[in-house]
Amino acid sequence: MSASNSWFHLKVPASSANLGPGFDALGLALGVYLTCRFRHSATLSITAAGRDACGIPASPDNLIWQTALTVARNQRMTMPPIELEIHNEIPLGKGMGSSAAALTAGVVIADELLDLGWKPLRILDEAARLEGHPDNVAPCTLGSIVASAIDSGGVTRAVRLPLPKSFDLAIVVPDFDLPTAKARAVLPSGYSREDAVFNVQRAALLIAALATGTTNVFPAAIEDRFHQPYREALVPGLHEILRLRAPGLLGCALSGAGPSILVFFERGYESVCELVEQIFRLNGHASETLHCSIPERGFELTRA
């Protein structure tokens, strides 16, 4: 194989958005990955393996490829055909940023093969435009925990928080899916000033707590009135899960739009996740717990 047609290796982390009160603004990277190998090819070839591979199209409809085509079209360029091998670890339809990881991968692939020379923040901006909100694609791109917003000019602004290791986390994944569109459809068109102030206070408190490792403000820091109360009817057991209290448990929140649950806990208290599993079980659903790191880096691209 010539060096000019060697494989690129791309790894994009999963993500958990909102973190309770930070609706469409806060997200963290998870050490569960979408990995891809790609290179130039005479014709398009896509294969998919790994978790939920049956839900990943091995065809031109694939989200990674469609994203790359969109980027090329927006730049008035033509995306060359590629050989793309996908290996997925991220549960699909569970609120762990599987689509954001695919979008990010598509932007990175287009950036590399079209020689756009984009830096990570430009890649983030493009991915956020395509996703419609930055809270998942920001940690996919930058890693760690990220606060992000889209400014009045439509440009994504993001700040990555270095993480003091003061807590651990896990994702409890139930055995049912919840489409993001369905989870967004139940949200109100507006909020009272009281609820807005409630969420602003807690989002600010949460950012400060995460940045400094001040865990004694949990679980108050992850309380929310913007989205979780409205989604309780879509996630059996969510009402009880959000109110769980136990030694070592810092608090629970929906992971993104759900149905998975993000569990913050003190080191050595992994067993608190069993309480969440039990609530799902009492509501007729099996679940599994994924103990996740928070990677310091977002996507990683190397060449063989």
UniProtKB/Swiss-Prot annotation:
Pathway: Amino-acid biosynthesis; L-threonine biosynthesis; L-threonine from L-aspartate: step 4/5. It is an enzyme of class 2 (transferase). GO terms for biological process: threonine biosynthetic process. It comes from the Bacteria. Gene3D superfamilies: 3.30.230.10, GHMP kinase, C-terminal domain. Its EC number is 2.7.1.39. GO terms for molecular function: ATP binding; homoserine kinase activity. It catalyses: L-homoserine + ATP = O-phospho-L-homoserine + ADP + H(+). The keyword Cell cycle does not apply. Keywords: Amino-acid biosynthesis, ATP-binding, Cytoplasm, Kinase, Nucleotide-binding, Threonine biosynthesis, Transferase. ATP binds at P91, L92, G93, K94, G95, M96, G97, S98, S99, A100, A101. It is found in: Cytoplasm. The keyword Ligase does not apply. InterPro entries: GHMP_kinase_C_dom, GHMP_kinase_C_sf, GHMP_kinase_N_dom, GHMP_knse_ATP-bd_CS, Homoserine_kinase, Ribosomal_Su5_D2-typ_SF, Ribsml_uS5_D2-typ_fold_subgr. Its main location: cytoplasm. GO terms for cellular component: cytoplasm. Belongs to the GHMP kinase family. Homoserine kinase subfamily. Catalyzes the ATP-dependent phosphorylation of L-homoserine to L-homoserine phosphate. This is Homoserine kinase.
